[in-house]
């Protein structure tokens, strides 16, 4: 039927569309108001269907375009409008006029529902006319007012699809809206489309574009637009110059702002107060206060009373520089010129005092300002924020009461400040009380209120209370957001309740709340930290599945998590995936990748990355140097490690005990003990305290060098410095003492370790058993051997051989033989010496059958070794 209407319409086009030109044909319906009312009553009182159609058909009126237009102007439901629009086509078998189509588009604009736009524009295109200028503007304007800029952009693109020419004002409205939300690329696309359509850009349009690009710091693009404007024979006006000064200055391009300032007079224009004030603000922000003062004095000299905004800017400049005496003096000068300082001027001073934490001085200024201006909401909020941060809650509540008397409280902004600051100072009960006291009729909590309280409660472990507040949020008119879910997930995981954390994520999906990249990154980080590396990997894939581009933090979390889980070898592949994607590394990302390379043995790659980091302007941190120094030390490239150590010191980086310990361990392992001692001495001179790893590294080096007496002195120093030995420490000493055959002394340390409640390692057990057996203390060795096995320990070959020899030397022939058989059953090698000692004992005790077995084993072992040598 729609196709029929289109065909018929085309046949009658000349009579209705003025030769296809896009003109609106005015229609009036002065005498038809009642008919329109009757139609609207039918459409608005019941559902659409055969009954509604029959009722409309029964109305005694002759269908006319005027009725369609009148009805569409009244309807607020786009679906009902389309149903009526189609019913009219079927009833009359006549095409709609341009004004009817435009009226339908205006219904879509009012409802912000453009689902049928493609179809309607297609019909209009076939009919040979398009949306009117006013309709086009209204559709875009409706989207802008509803903050649906992407939909507004899509409306324009759909018009272009059907070869319609979007209105000039539709483009400029959208460009202005995108400028306000810093979407400069969208602005530029629309601007280029305007040029393609032959629209002549104005200075005002160029001003909007230049401001947008400059605000985002895209200076080259902004300057390019400025050059394009000049090449279009358009002269910059004072507004454009003011925008350039302000925008370029705010992104730190002070010299460029000066250049624009000097260009003004060169081009025959005169700087106004906005020009001067903008330039003063730029200079103050750049800490060029002397130049700002000079400019303000020039302004003051040439104008009897500079504008209040100029005074406020200069006062803020003085305050930011901590020059409060000058700021107060300027207030007096302002008064002397007959200009009473405004509340904004005082708020500027209070803001600066807040940044510096000068609470008492701020309260004095607050009392002083009452002589000139009534404090406003911002004034009270600045002070309450300061007082809560400083822990002066009683004064903050007194100020809140003053606000109430002034009619400024309750208001949700003040409540949010107080709840947030109370949470951050861990005054959770007070924050909860304030939340509960909120009068929903006067002051309703918003998303910020809920977010602050949920996060505050969660951080101190009150996750169940946080969840209850979240449930209240679900019951309220506030929409949950990714910030709330991020906080809940993180805090549940941080307090050991990972299953609840997973449940929160599922709740979020069920609530149709889309996660953002920050939430997904946080969730992935939580899973890795909770020991769930496979789930962490899966979340990284989900990030991509949700059409997010993983950023530097995503990769950093993944690489760091895999390193901790023992998959450091995957760092290389992930790093190059990151590079191929064009992901820009920050310092944290560099540090994590460098650490990963070091841990998987790719120290050369780590070293190269350290150099790349420097060339790209990122300063290596103590973490960077620590990873590479440790990596080099572990592969005995100690001279290179020491050079990096010296480089870090030359850059005044505060080196920590971990870096010193890496070098001590490295030098100790290769026997360069004197250098290890020198580094330990430097560590202590720096005021650092050696940690357990430091002492264990040094002890291990001394034991390996068989300097056992020095090791014992070192052990004593360690205890004197209040560093408690652990099982590794005792294991090193026991092994060292056994190595130099001081078995009884080793056993003393063994007993000391047991008294401390430490569980010896397998190496400590086997070393001690072997040592006691070799020392002839076979009773203790045997008891220790049995206890070790009873606790699930598995003795090694050295342990069995030592026990067999010890029992043999103690003339316990059959006990020794039993262990000999046990050793054979376990498939462990038995030394020739052990066999000889056992054989001798068995012969002495007339255990001839057992001696024959041992002799046979000894012969077989000898043959095997001879064959191996021959081979």
UniProtKB/Swiss-Prot annotation:
PROSITE patterns per UniProt: PPR
Domain of life: Eukaryota
SUPFAM superfamilies: TPR-like (SSF48452)
Keywords for this protein: Repeat
Signal peptide start and end residues: none
InterPro entries: Pentatricopeptide_rpt, PPR_P_subfamily, TPR-like_helical_dom_sf
Pfam families xrefs: PPR, PPR_1, PPR_2, PPR_3
Ranges of the PPR repeats in the UniProt entry: 97-131, 132-166, 167-201, 202-236, 237-271, 272-306, 307-341, 342-372, 376-410, 411-445, 446-480, 481-515, 516-550, 551-585, 586-620, 621-655, 656-690, 691-725, 726-760, 761-795, 796-830
Family: Belongs to the PPR family. P subfamily.
Protein name per its UniProtKB record: Pentatricopeptide repeat-containing protein At3g06920
Organism for this UniProt entry: Arabidopsis thaliana (Mouse-ear cress)
């Amino acid at each position: 039927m729609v196709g029929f209407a289109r065909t018929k319409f085309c046949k009658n086009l000349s009579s209705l569309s003025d030769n296809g030109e896009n003109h609106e044909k005015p229609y009036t319906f002065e005498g038809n108001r009642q008919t329109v009312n009757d139609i609207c009553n039918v459409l608005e009182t019941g559902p659409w269907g055969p009954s509604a159609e029959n009722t409309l058909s029964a109305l005694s009126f002759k269908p006319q375009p005027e009725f369609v237009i009148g009805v569409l102007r009244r309807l607020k439901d786009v679906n009902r409008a389309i149903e009526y629009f189609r019913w009219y086509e079927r009833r009359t078998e006549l095409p709609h006029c341009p004004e009817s189509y435009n009226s339908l588009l205006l219904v879509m604009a009012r409802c912000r529902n453009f689902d049928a736009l493609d179809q309607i524009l297609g019909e209009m295109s076939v009919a040979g006319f398009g949306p009117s200028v006013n309709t086009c503007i209204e559709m875009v304007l409706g989207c802008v007012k509803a903050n649906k800029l992407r939909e507004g952009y899509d409306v324009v693109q759909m018009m272009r699809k059907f070869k319609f020419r979007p209105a000039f004002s539709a483009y400029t409205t959208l460009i202005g809206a995108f400028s306000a939300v810093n979407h400069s690329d969208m602005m530029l696309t629309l601007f280029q489309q305007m040029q393609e359509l032959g629209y002549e850009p104005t200075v005002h349009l160029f001003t909007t574009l230049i401001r947008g690009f400059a605000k985002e710091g895209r200076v080259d693009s902004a300057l390019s637009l400025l050059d394009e404007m000049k090449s279009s024979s358009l002269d910059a006006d004072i507004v454009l110059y003011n925008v350039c000064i302000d925008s370029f200055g705010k992104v730190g391009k002070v010299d460029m702002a000066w250049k624009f300032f000097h260009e003004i007079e060169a081009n025959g224009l005169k700087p106004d107060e906005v020009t001067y004030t903008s330039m003063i603000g730029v200079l103050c922000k750049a800490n060029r206060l002397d130049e700002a003062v000079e400019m303000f004095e020039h302004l003051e000299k040439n104008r009897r009373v500079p504008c209040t905004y100029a005074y406020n800017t200069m006062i803020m400049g003085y305050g930011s520089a901590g020059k409060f005496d000058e700021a107060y003096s300027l207030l007096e000068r302002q008064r002397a010129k007959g200009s009473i300082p405004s509340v904004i001027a005082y708020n500027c001073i209070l803001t600066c005092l807040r940044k510096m934490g000068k609470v008492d001085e701020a309260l004095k200024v607050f009392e002083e300002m009452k002589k000139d201006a009534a404090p406003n909401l911002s004034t009270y909020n600045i002070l309450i924020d300061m007082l809560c941060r400083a822990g002066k809650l009683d004064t903050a509540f007194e100020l809140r009461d003053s606000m109430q008397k002034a009619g400024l409280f309750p208001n949700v902004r003040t409540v949010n400040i107080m709840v947030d600051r109370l949470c951050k100072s861990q005054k959770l009960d007070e924050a909860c009380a304030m939340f509960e006291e909120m009068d929903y009729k006067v002051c309703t909590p918003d998303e910020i209120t809920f977010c602050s309280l949920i996060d505050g409660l969660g951080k101190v472990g009150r996750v169940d209370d946080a969840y209850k507040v979240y449930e209240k949020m679900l019951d309220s008119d506030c929409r949950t957001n990714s910030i709330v879910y991020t906080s809940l997930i993180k805090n549940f995981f941080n307090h050991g309740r990972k299953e609840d954390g997973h449940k929160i994520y599922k709740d979020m999906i069920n609530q149709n709340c889309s996660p953002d990249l920050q939430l997904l990154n946080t969730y992935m980080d939580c899973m890795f930290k909770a020991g769930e590396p496979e789930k962490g990997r899966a979340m990284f894939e989900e990030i991509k599945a949700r059409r997010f581009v993983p950023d530097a933090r995503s990769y950093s979390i993944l690489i760091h998590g895999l390193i901790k889980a023992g998959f450091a070898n995957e760092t290389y592949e992930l790093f190059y995936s990151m590079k191929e994607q064009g992901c820009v590394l920050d310092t944290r990302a560099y540090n994590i990748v460098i650490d990963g390379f070091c841990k998987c043995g790719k120290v050369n790659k780590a070293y190269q990355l350290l150099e790349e980091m420097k060339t790209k302007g990122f300063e290596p941190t103590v973490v960077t140097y620590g990873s590479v120094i440790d990596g080099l030390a572990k592969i005995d490239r100690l001279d290179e490690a020491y050079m990096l150590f010296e480089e870090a010191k030359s850059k005044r980086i505060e080196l920590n005990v971990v870096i010193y310990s890496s070098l001590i361990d490295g030098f100790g392992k290769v026997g360069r003990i004197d250098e290890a001692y020198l580094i330990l001495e430097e560590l202590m001179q720096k005021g650092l305290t050696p940690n357990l790893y430091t002492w264990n590294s040094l002890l291990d080096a001394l034991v390996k060098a068989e300097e056992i007496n020095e090791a014992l002195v070192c052990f004593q120093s360690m205890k004197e410095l209040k560093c408690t030995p652990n099982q590794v420490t005792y294991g090193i000493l026991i092994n060292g003492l056994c190595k130099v055959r001081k078995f009884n002394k080793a056993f003393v340390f063994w007993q000391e370790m047991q008294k401390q409640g430490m569980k010896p390692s397998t190496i400590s057990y086997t070393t001690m058993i072997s040592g006691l057996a070799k020392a002839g203390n076979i009773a203790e060795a045997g008891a220790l051997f049995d206890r070790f096995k009873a606790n699930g320990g598995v003795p090694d070959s050295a342990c069995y051989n030592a026990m067999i020899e010890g029992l043999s030397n103690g003339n316990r022939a059959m006990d020794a033989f039993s262990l000999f058989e046990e050793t054979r059953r376990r498939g462990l090698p038995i030394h020739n010496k052990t066999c000889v000692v056992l054989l001798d004992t068995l012969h002495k005790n007339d255990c001839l059958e057992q001696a024959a077995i041992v002799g046979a084993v000894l012969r077989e072992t000898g043959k095997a070794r001879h064959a191996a040598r021959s081979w």
